[in-house]
């Protein structure tokens, strides 16, 4: 790369020298002046003419209408300082001159005066016609044409040399070529062992790796490997990393491109790039094509607004044709990632194109611990850092969040000139990631501090009493971002379902802040605005999605609707005005009940509430153990009890393959046992014939439903 840049700069420098030389020659040819010429004013010329110092002269009309007079002196004259600087530099100092020039305005009186003076002095006058600048005119006409043809020639020659960027050779003529960057298999060092927290997803991709390594193993049994694998999940879960790991394990060429790189301002460019991409991949088969953020080009057709989507739809049509046009034995597999699968075209998701869809969700506690260990390899950790505890404290964090957490902790440690990352650094980094940097210099009155302290203590008291689903992780009154303080609630365990009891407890916890304000200060403040926002969202989901309302019944009114604006199949709202009013009534009922419950809890624990609030005013931040100790004994403990178990780590490719076989054997045994039980029950005529319930559950993807980690931000 360094040599290429050096050659580019050398060629540019040579071109610059050539251009400067041409300009200098043109200037020398058309604009040079004689160094032995003295310029005279009109008055001086007439004076010299009357004094009989002029031998002869010529009068010639100029381009600008001014007459030019040029002639010879009878005797050599001394040169003046008005000589041209260019002439002085090139020819040296001139001691005397024999020629002169002068300019006269084109009026009859001036010309008549000059002619009369010349006749009296006996000086010959030689009139000349206006000179025609033939070469200048020809250059003005021909030069733009030559430049245009030179540019066309440069573009055509550059396009034949190969693909280039928009600023290099061939850049203008290479719009139809793919921008996919083929990665060398030898340079791809990412393996399955580098991907943590996605063990089930890696097992799903083992077959893809096996096919790329040994396609005959599948083709001889009549099996067809999936032509496309769609990696779906929220941002930051590692979809791109998984695709790189597949290419690294298979040791095959890896073509990566973004969905937005297909479409340009020119018509037909996207479809041409798709054809070029698949053509290059087939030449390098077995290979992998990875399209990142495929929703940029794969959105549902016919749902656009304004009719400006023709180019994108042509590109999508070409992708559909290419994916359904090549055979699996050609060894080209398409991997794509998206976090908006709901807007993808149904033809793109059908069998034969993206046959397999893998949900890459947020990792569980073991996955988070494994991810932390991967990102902590190059960071020195202090003895008080327990990655297992950090994993338990960060539910809902994805891989990108955990990497950012450790990076922030390392930056804080470097800022404090520490030799290792401590637990305090990680704790501060977690607060920065969740709520923003601390604003310790913000000046607040004592009344505001007390209001915030009792507000957050109210959240803590309700959370400590209603602790079946959640625990109080931390409470602080240190301002961070736009929050004046917050109470951090975490699920006790990894939750995949939320019961009605859990939802109502969470609502009561959110209402604890306003309940404390009314009980202590007897005045409401704006600090509970974020509490109400989250409480309204939870209550609305209970009513419209989860069927937790007797008045509305077990119906889903809103759900995970398609948010694609141009989708004609997405009416909003999908219910009547009367139903909308009933939803508002039920949401209001749930929030009011939660508020009354929070008031009752705080009234029954006044001493604990006051103790936690006073501790917040003194220490500003309390962790889980300190809060629980204050609630139970009224004192703050001095140390914490830590749990030690075998640390989690990401599985390698061979371990993932073995786990896949093991899980498959277990699933088959469970399925056989379930079928036997179903047949026995059917013989007893207790239930009708149907697919076993366990098999139905196994077919459904497991989705992790976690609410926001920060259950309150005191705005």
UniProtKB/Swiss-Prot annotation:
Zn(2+) binds at residues 455, 459, 531. Residues 32-137 are extracellular. Its main location: membrane. GO terms for biological process: protein catabolic process; proteolysis. The chain crosses the membrane at residues 11-31, 138-158. Keywords: ATP-binding, Cell membrane, Hydrolase, Membrane, Metal-binding, Metalloprotease, Nucleotide-binding, Protease, Stress response, Transmembrane, Transmembrane helix, Zinc. Its EC number is 3.4.24.-. The keyword Magnesium does not apply. GO terms for cellular component: plasma membrane. It is an enzyme of class 3 (hydrolase). ATP binds at residues 233-240. Induction: Induced by heat shock (37 degrees Celsius) and osmotic shock (0.5 M NaCl) but not by exposure to alcohol, sulfite or ethidium bromide. Residues 1-10, 159-715 are cytoplasmic. GO terms for molecular function: ATP binding; ATP hydrolysis activity; ATP-dependent peptidase activity; metalloendopeptidase activity; zinc ion binding. The active site is at residue 456. InterPro entries: AAA+_ATPase, AAA_lid_3, ATPase_AAA_core, FtsH, P-loop_NTPase, Pept_M41_FtsH_extracell, Peptidase_M41, Peptidase_M41-like. Gene3D superfamilies: 1.10.8.60, P-loop containing nucleotide triphosphate hydrolases, Peptidase M41. Homohexamer. Acts as a processive, ATP-dependent zinc metallopeptidase for both cytoplasmic and membrane proteins. Plays a role in the quality control of integral membrane proteins. Can complement an E.coli ftsH disruption mutant. This is ATP-dependent zinc metalloprotease FtsH. It comes from Oenococcus oeni.
């Amino acid at each position: 790369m360094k040599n290429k840049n050096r050659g580019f700069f050398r060629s540019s420098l040579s071109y610059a020298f050539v251009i400067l030389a041409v300009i200098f020659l043109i200037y020398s040819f058309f604009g040079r002046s004689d160094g032995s010429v003295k310029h005279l004013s009109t008055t001086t010329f007439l004076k010299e003419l009357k004094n009989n110092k002029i031998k002869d002269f010529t009068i010639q009309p100029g381009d600008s209408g001014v007459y030019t007079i040029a002639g010879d002196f009878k005797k050599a004259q001394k040169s003046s300082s008005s000589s041209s600087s260019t002439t002085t530099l090139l020819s040296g100092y001139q001691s005397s001159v024999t020629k002169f020039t002068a300019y006269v305005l084109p009026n009859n009186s001036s010309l008549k005066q000059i002619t009369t003076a010349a006749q009296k002095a006996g000086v010959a006058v030689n009139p000349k016609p206006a000179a025609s600048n033939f070469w200048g005119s020809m250059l003005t006409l021909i030069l733009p044409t030559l430049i245009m043809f030179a540019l066309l020639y440069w573009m055509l020659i550059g396009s034949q040399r190969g693909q280039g960027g928009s600023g290099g050779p061939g850049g203008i003529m290479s719009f139809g070529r793919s921008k996919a960057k083929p990665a060398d298999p030898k340079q791809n060092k990412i393996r399955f062992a580098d991907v943590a927290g996605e063990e089930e997803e890696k097992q799903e991709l083992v077959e893809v790796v096996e096919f790329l390594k040994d396609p005959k193993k599948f083709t001889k049994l009549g099996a067809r490997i999936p032509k496309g694998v769609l990696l779906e999940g929220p941002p930051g879960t590692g979809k791109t990393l998984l695709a790189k790991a597949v290419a690294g394990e298979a040791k095959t060429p890896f073509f990566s491109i973004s969905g937005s790189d297909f479409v340009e301002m020119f018509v037909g460019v996207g479809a041409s790039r798709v054809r070029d991409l698949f053509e290059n991949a087939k030449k390098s088969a077995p290979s992998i094509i990875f399209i990142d953020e495929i929703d940029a080009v794969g959105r549902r057709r016919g749902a656009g607004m304004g009719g400006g989507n023709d180019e994108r739809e042509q590109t999508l049509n070409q992708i559909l044709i290419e994916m359904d046009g090549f055979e699996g034995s050609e060894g080209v597999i398409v991997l794509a990632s998206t976090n908006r699968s709901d807007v993808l075209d149904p033809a793109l998701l059908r069998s034969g194109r993206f046959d397999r869809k893998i949900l890459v969700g947020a990792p569980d506690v073991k996955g988070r611990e494994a991810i932390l260990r991967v990102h902590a390899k190059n960071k020195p950790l202090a003895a008080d850092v327990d990655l297992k505890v950090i994993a338990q404290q960060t539910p809902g964090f994805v891989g990108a969040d955990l990497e950012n957490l450790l990076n922030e902790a390392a930056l804080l440690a470097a800022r404090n000139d520490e030799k290792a990352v401590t637990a305090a650094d990680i704790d501060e980094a977690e607060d920065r990631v969740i709520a923003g940097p601390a604003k310790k210099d913000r000046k607040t009155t004592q009344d505001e501090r007390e209001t915030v302290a009792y507000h957050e203590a109210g959240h803590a008291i309700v959370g400590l009493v209603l602790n079946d689903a959640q625990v109080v992780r931390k409470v602080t009154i240190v301002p961070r971002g736009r929050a004046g303080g917050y109470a951090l609630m975490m699920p006790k365990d990894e939750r995949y379902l939320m019961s009605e009891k859990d939802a109502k407890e969470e609502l009561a916890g959110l209402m604890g802040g306003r309940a404390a304000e009314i009980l202590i200060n007897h005045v409401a403040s704006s600090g509970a605005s974020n509490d109400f926002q989250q409480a309204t969202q939870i209550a609305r989901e209970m009513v419209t999605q989860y069927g937790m309302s007797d008045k509305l019944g077990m119906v889903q009114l809103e759900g995970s609707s398609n948010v694609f604006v141009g989708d004609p199949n997405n009416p909003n709202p999908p219910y009547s005005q009367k139903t909308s009013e009933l939803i508002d009534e039920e949401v209001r009922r749930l929030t009011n009940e939660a508020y009354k419950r929070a008031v009752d809890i705080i009234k029954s624990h006044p001493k604990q509430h006051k103790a936690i609030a006073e501790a917040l005013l003194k220490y500003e931040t309390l962790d889980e153990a300190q809060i629980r100790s204050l609630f139970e004994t009224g004192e703050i403990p001095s140390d914490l009890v830590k749990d030690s178990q075998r640390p989690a780590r990401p599985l390698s490719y061979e371990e993932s393959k073995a786990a896949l076989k093991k899980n498959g054997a277990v699933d088959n045994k469970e399925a056989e046992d379930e079928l036997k039980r179903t047949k026995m029950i059917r013989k007893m005529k207790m239930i009708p014939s149907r697919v076993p319930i366990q098999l139905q559950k196994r077919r459904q993807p497991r989705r992790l439903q976690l609410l926001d980690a920060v259950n309150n931000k005191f705005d």
